Amino acid sequence: MNKKKTILLVMPANFGIYKAIEKNLVFNEFNVITLAYDESLFIYPSLITRLQTKFRRYIFRDKNAKHNSKSKVFQKTSQFQRISQQLTEVGGADYALFIRADIWSEEFLRNIRQSVKKDMIAYQWDGMNRFPQVWQNLQWFDRFYVFDPKDFHGESYQFLPITNFYLDYPLEDNSITSDFYFIGSHLSDRQDVIIKF
């Protein structure tokens, strides 16, 4: 009997999409360890940490100061400690799938990399230039998927094409109450296109 492969799923908790992806990975016989991060819950642990971050951001012009502070604070949370413990218990993950790789600091990615036996894979569900921090994190991934055709042209990094999510687990028989819906973040420059659709 083959042992199930373990995959670490790391992504934002936005809209609960991680639950569907996690369910699909389980359906495809993966042991899934999920790290769903809710950025909206971030608070600085102290006034000093907040002031140090602001100082780095404005005096040293460190554009990543807040980003790095968030990542460091997160690594001290019980959620991160739980994930680390789970990875230790299973002897590390076979794979890691990151959606929105821009959220994490290099230190965090380096720590996770040490727990992954095979491939670390990323998917940037927004265009690469919407969250420019992602460019600094490319080195940590074996494969990097993007959906926006603009991201394929003119870059030295070899991106791989992918569409948005395809979930192949059996769906519940729900009656349809609408014929069109949109799940995503509101961007005013997309509004006219959606209305005309």
Model-derived segments and spans:
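A generic structural signal for ordered secondary structure
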Residues: 1-2, 7, 110, 119-121
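Nucleotide-sugar donor-binding catalytic core of glycosyltransferases
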Residues: 2-53, 67-68, 75-83, 90-91, ...
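Glycosyltransferases and closely related glycan-assembly transferases
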Residues: 26, 85-95, 105-120, 139
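Compositionally biased, intrinsically disordered low-complexity segments
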Residues: 51-54, 58, 79, 115, ...
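Aromatic- and Gly/Pro-rich amphipathic surface segment
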Residues: 56-69
